[in-house]
Structure formats: C-alpha cells, structure tokens
C-alpha cells in the first residue's frame, strides 16, 4: 500500500545475520476515521486499511488477476499456484481462501482441484500482533473468523525457511517462506523431474518502493520471469517506475488501472507469449495436465516412509496401493512409540536443516491426524508431552538456543525442570525444554493413513520391476489359500520404492546404504516405580519415555491397553541386519540411562530378562541425507528411503516434496536441499563405487 504522509520511513539497517529472522515491529497508529492501523516499524508503511483493506485486497489482487474466473475454470485435479511477495498479516491469503471456498461450494468439479499459495516474508508479524490485527476482521466478517482461527492455529514459529501449512479439507496448501525474498525465490526449483512448475498469478504486495526499495531489484523481476509462463498475471498497488520497468524488462505487458473507490492507480501485468518463446522448449512442459496426471501409484514398503508417501499422493487424488512382503510397520518403523523432538542446530543454519523443517511440518500433520483419530474414535497419533533434553549428547550450547522461539525450544529453571520431569534429586541446571515435542504412536498413525479412501494395502513380495514408456509393471509373489506361492502382476503409472535397506535389491540405481541395528527396550513399572520414574520423555545419551498402552499396541508389540509402560532406547550396532531380541542390548539401554541419571538405579528393575524389546534395522546414507526423488534414466520410478533414525520427523516433509515433484509442483524444500536428497547425487555414488572397489581389492 502507499505510505501515508504522516508515517516516516525507518532507514535503520538491520544487523541481523542472514537466515536469522527479525520479526516485524508493529506500531499502532490512528487513521482519520479513528481506526487503529497496524504500521510497520521497519518501513513506516501501513499493512492495510482497517476500513476497507479486505475490499482493496479483493479488488487489486483477486479481481485484477481474474481469479474468480480462472479458479472456477480449473479442471479436476488441476493445481493453481499463486506467489505473494509480502505475506504481512495474511490478508490476501484470507481473501483468496474465502473466494476458493465459495467457488468450491458452487462448482462441484473443483472438488479435486488444488490451490497452492506460496508467500514470502522477511519480517513476519509475531503471533500476538497477528491475532490482534485480524480480530476486528473476524468480527466484521464472520465467514473469515473460521479461516483466521485455522491460520492462527497453524501459524509457524518465526524461524527461517519454508513452513508448509496444509488446509486439507479445502485442498489448499500454504507455503510461507520466511527470509529474504531473493533467497526464497531462488529456492524454488523450476527444473525438478520432467515437469516445469510455474506461477499462475503474482501478488506483488511488498511495501512500496519509497519505503522498501531494496525489495524491488532486478533479481526479483528475473526470478518472476524464470517462474512464469505465457499468460501468468501480476498485480500490485504501486505504479512506481522501478516496478514498471522491472516487469517490462522481463517480458510482462503492463497496464494501469484505478484502485477501487480512489483516484490512485494500480498496476497489472501479463507475461507475453514472446517472452515464453525465449525459454528452452524442454522447460515449457508445464504442470501435469489431465491427460498425463497419474491415476494410480504403487508404494513398495509399509513403514513410515511408505505410509507417509501414500498419504501425500492420495491427498492429491491419486489411487495408491501400498505393497509390503510383511504386515505394515513390521520393520524398524513399528516400535511402540517414536520420540518426535527437534534435533537442534545453530539458528543461522536452520534454513537448510532438514530435521528442523521436517519436525515442524510433522507436528502440524500429526495434530491434524489427531483430529481424524478423534472422529474415528481411535488413539491419538501424537501425544504432545513436551520433552526435556539434558544436553548430555549435543553439538549445541544453550547460548545458541536463545534466538529460537520459546514454543520450539527454551531453557527453563532447574526447579521447573525438576517439577515437570519428576526428577527431584537430579541437578538439571543444564537443560533444553521442547514444549511441542512428544510421542508418536506408529500403530495409530498406520490406522489413520490406511483409512484414506484412496489408499489400499496388499501383502506382496516384489520380485521384478519393469518400466515401459507408459507404465511400470510389477511382478510379485504371495501365499495363496493353500499356502503355495502365487504370482501376481500389477501395473502402475508411478512406483515409489520405500523399502529401507532392501531398496537397493529392488533397483541397483538406489545406492546400497549403511545398515544400523537398533533395539528398543521397555518394561511394565509398578505403581511405586511410576511415582519415581520421569514423567515426560527425556533425551540424554539415549532417550526414555513413559507411555500408556493403547488399542492396537497388543497387535504389534503385545502391550495391553491402558497398561503403563516405560521405554528406553536404543542400541546402535553398525552392519548388523539380524532382528533377534538380545538381553545384552537391553543392558546397554539400561546402562546408558543409569550412567547419565544414577539417581534412577534404585528405581529401574535390574532383572533385564523380564524386559520386553524390539529390534529393527535403520538405513542411512554415508552423508546422512535420505534418498528422495526420481531415479536416473527413469520417468516413473522413485526412491523414498534411508530415513535413518529420524523417519517420523522427516518422512512427512520428504513425502510432500516427492509428491510435488511427481506432479510438477513447487516443493516445500529448496532446490539446494532437493539436490542433497537426490538418489542420483554424484557424491554418494562416488563413495559407494570407491567402497565397492576397495572390497574387491
């Protein structure tokens, strides 16, 4: 919006390091009508008018990008992508979301269409300010009140990187990239797989050049050209010369229009055909069209990677068959509980830290699954207990946590740490508390995912995979009713291999990974022991957690419903692929806990033979990144494996990225991150070839 004359521009330069977020400084000023107006302290510009901000958003960005008509004319399963420069208060998102919901009610063919709203913000509005700013809007427009509530519930912590918020019931995906706009735009990969994603409409809503000239650079307009195609539109409040020249230089045809109810002018633009003709022909294979949109896919492997991949594909309208030679969660993913807690890194590295990005998305997704579980009257997927890290084994000091939002990680007083943990006799001066961390129930997760109407599960041992021009043919075997092996052939549009360390056996293009055996231990504490054991999950040189048995636990791990349990994890045996239960590894788990918390030596039962345990095989690459993407020289065969010990934290975001790549959409991971995850990355294959040559010698 144009800068009010009374609002002076702040020219103070930020000294915040790159990739460390500096939240917006909100100043409240009173306009001529007596309304409180939120103003950016950084740029001296109003976010929007409290009197008619929503109407202006509809007029400038929705109407002048022809969104009512363009969205109504989407074909089934088509995805429309909007990119907004300047998320601000989320007003444009809310206006677009409101329109999208209205259109879906009156246009049944939009039931399977999707809206992808990508936005960037360098100085995001803190949660408390955002709630205050949007409250009057919700009061005046009850239809928006529900959307505001959903946005605030999902609003991410203010750390750099992409935060994906899925509003699944509305087929709306919101990607909020926090950080410099140039970095965020550069992170969008327009060359993934065989499809070229593109932006359909641009909302240029950054503060006016008179306040924020640094935003409107040649690089911004160059990225717009790279990410657009013929017919891509743009709209902005500003008619400043720097914006007009920037758009024209990149092939946009511009036009001035009047702002609703005002003498002020605004700008619209359309990418010309000639500009698109300058691009290589190969880059013009746009998003998946109805003719080549995959109808079905097969996922091989029913562990956490396979289940989450199936979920992401099914949510995009693809019929998914999950195949596994064993029952779901029979491998390393089937422990009684999985600890979901952030693996902390210095905050200036978080922008490209897969575990941090994945942890935040996983938490949001699992909380959505909790809602579905409540409807199905099944156990919660995520029990948000909070987790206390005793900082026994860490590469980060508490001083490096100070810039993290308290909702993600914070240090607490020793007294409070003792109170929430129940460890009254333990010195907890050094600690890190993660309030949104907790325990994932794998069996409950499987139940919710396999209940999706687009997902089916079948037990089948895959013997052969053959790719043709138009499909992939799978041959497998299974026991028939007479206990004989019967052969079965399945044809699919796409296949995703999620078979952990056995992935290499299914396709040699998937590098052979490191195998690490891990055994988790648990026991049933007495009532007296329960009063003395930790009351929430703890991280030390291992980890431990109390939990209560739920329905489904008996089937997978022989744990009775409503029975208290205490688990300890986990052993780490390199190169061992046997999954027999071993007393010596139960002892190792016991010893790690007692070494770090000797106060519990008199509490834990020391007869290890009475403990229960489960062993699984983790799969890990030499560079610790999973294998996610399309296999070399293939158009239909994908890898989603090698999650290591972090599957429940990183599989959801990796599955989203894979599904987006398959369908030619922008992913929530940067181009650099996708390159590091590629199953074809050169560094990984060079290491593998070197080790193979050494073995032969």
Curated annotation (Swiss-Prot):
Cofactor: FAD
Region (FAD-dependent cmnm(5)s(2)U34 oxidoreductase) location: 300-697
Any single GO BP term: tRNA wobble base modification
Example of a GO cellular component annotation carried by this entry: cytoplasm
E.C. number(s) listed in UniProt: 2.1.1.61, 1.5.-.-
SUPFAM superfamilies: Nucleotide-binding domain
Region (tRNA (mnm(5)s(2)U34)-methyltransferase), start-end ranges: 1-272
Keywords for the protein's UniProt record, in alphabetical order: Cytoplasm, FAD, Flavoprotein, Methyltransferase, Multifunctional enzyme, Oxidoreductase, S-adenosyl-L-methionine, Transferase, tRNA processing
Gene Ontology MF annotations: flavin adenine dinucleotide binding; oxidoreductase activity, acting on the CH-NH group of donors; tRNA (5-methylaminomethyl-2-thiouridylate)(34)-methyltransferase activity
Catalytic activity: 5-aminomethyl-2-thiouridine(34) in tRNA + S-adenosyl-L-methionine = 5-methylaminomethyl-2-thiouridine(34) in tRNA + S-adenosyl-L-homocysteine + H(+)
Subcellular location: Cytoplasm
Keyword Membrane belongs to the record: no
Superkingdom classification of source: Bacteria
Keyword Isomerase: no
Pfam families named in the record: DAO (PF01266), Methyltransf_30 (PF05430)
PANTHER family registered for this protein in UniProt: SARCOSINE DEHYDROGENASE-RELATED, TRNA 5-METHYLAMINOMETHYL-2-THIOURIDINE BIOSYNTHESIS BIFUNCTIONAL PROTEIN MNMC
Record's function text: Catalyzes the last two steps in the biosynthesis of 5-methylaminomethyl-2-thiouridine (mnm(5)s(2)U) at the wobble position (U34) in tRNA. Catalyzes the FAD-dependent demodification of cmnm(5)s(2)U34 to nm(5)s(2)U34, followed by the transfer of a methyl group from S-adenosyl-L-methionine to nm(5)s(2)U34, to form mnm(5)s(2)U34.
Family named by the database record: In the N-terminal section; belongs to the methyltransferase superfamily. tRNA (mnm(5)s(2)U34)-methyltransferase family. In the C-terminal section; belongs to the DAO family.
Name this protein carries in UniProt: tRNA 5-methylaminomethyl-2-thiouridine biosynthesis bifunctional protein MnmC
Protein source organism: Psychrobacter cryohalolentis (strain ATCC BAA-1226 / DSM 17306 / VKM B-2378 / K5)
